Amino acid sequence: MATSEELKQLRCDCTYRSKLAEQAERYDEMADAMRTLVEQCVNNDKDELTVEERNLLSVAYKNAVGARRASWRIISSVEQKEMSKANVHNKNVAATYRKKVEEELNNICQDILNLLTKKLIPNTSESESKVFYYKMKGDYYRYISEFSCDEGKKEASNCAQEAYQKATDIAENELPSTHPIRLGLALNYSVFFYEILNQPHQACEMAKRAFDDAITEFDNVSEDSYKDSTLIMQLLRDNLTLWTSDLQGDQTEEKSKDEGLE
């Protein structure tokens, strides 16, 4: 059993290693460092992550998954083109490669979901952190649903919606409408409605409500939150423009914007 001093040193070392890995753009190793920190150091609500640690965790997994999500989209597109050309051999090669990326994606998503479910969510008492972690849980189940099929897709989608809704219930009661975490949640939850559930009207309604609520209270936005809040509000507005255009029958190849790295 490690002493409190040893755990404190481990926490500092993991944070430093994570920052080094981020500077070197080695995001898998950044995630490894933050996983070690969470597994070894978060055992009750007195041990919960600082804002800096929480953000390092988020950046690590977001980038590790983001690169593979982009790869998956490219490979899937190539696979579809080979299929349309009836090139069975190349289509099969692309499919095998796609499945390899899907396995990597699934492993990373399950890794962070395990940390969220067993360590982070049970051991936090702060409303802001609860919203942050439930939003993350929704995001990573959403990513799983992007590449899953049939029952796997349905199960991941249900888990994502449940997590997003829990985050929303807390955020709407505990966080101001201009808070960047609440805005980011509305952004990603609305993308989930649009991209995964194929419910564009609900997506537009959610994004518009979040944007309008924030505009109403924008004079009260804190100086610390101003930059992040305005950026997310712009993404909400961009999506609303795109989705409204789609609903009016103007087809576009442009993809919805969320806080994930595309």
UniProtKB/Swiss-Prot annotation:
Zinc-finger among the record's keywords?
A: no
Q: Which key words tag this protein in UniProt? A: Cell membrane, Cytoplasm, Membrane, Nucleus
User: Which GO-annotated molecular functions does the record name?
Assistant: histone binding; histone reader activity; kinase binding
- Predominantly, its location class is membrane
Q: Report the GO terms under cellular component.
A: cytoplasm; extrinsic component of plasma membrane; nucleus; protein-containing complex
InterPro entries, per database record: 14-3-3, 14-3-3_CS, 14-3-3_dom_sf, 14-3-3_domain
Classify the protein's membrane topology as the record does.
Answer: Peripheral membrane protein
Q: Record's superkingdom?
A: Eukaryota
Record Pfam families: 14-3-3
Q: Would the keyword Membrane be found if you checked this record's keyword annotation? A: yes
The record's Gene Ontology biological-process terms are: protein localization; signal transduction
Q: Where in the cell is it found?
A: Cell membrane; Cytoplasm; Nucleus
What task does this protein carry out?
Answer: Adapter protein which binds to its partners, usually via a phosphoserine or phosphothreonine motif. Binding generally results in the modulation of the activity and/or cellular localization of the binding partner. Via its interaction with CDPK1 and PKAr, involved in merozoite microneme secretion and thus in merozoite invasion of host erythrocytes.
Q: Tell me, how does this one assemble? A: Homodimer. Forms a complex composed of CDPK1, PKA regulatory subunit PKAr and 14-3-3I; the complex is formed in merozoites in response to low extracellular level of K(+) and may play a role in microneme secretion. Interacts with CDPK1 (when phosphorylated) in a Ca(2+)-independent manner; the interaction does not regulate CDPK1 catalytic activity but is required for merozoite invasion of host erythrocytes. Interacts with PKA regulatory subunit PKAr (when phosphorylated) in a Ca(2+)-dependent manner.
Q: Which family does it belong to?
A: Belongs to the 14-3-3 family.
Report what the protein is called.
Answer: 14-3-3 protein I
Q: What organism, scientifically named, is this protein from?
A: Plasmodium falciparum (isolate 3D7)
User: Which gene codes for it?
Assistant: 14-3-3I
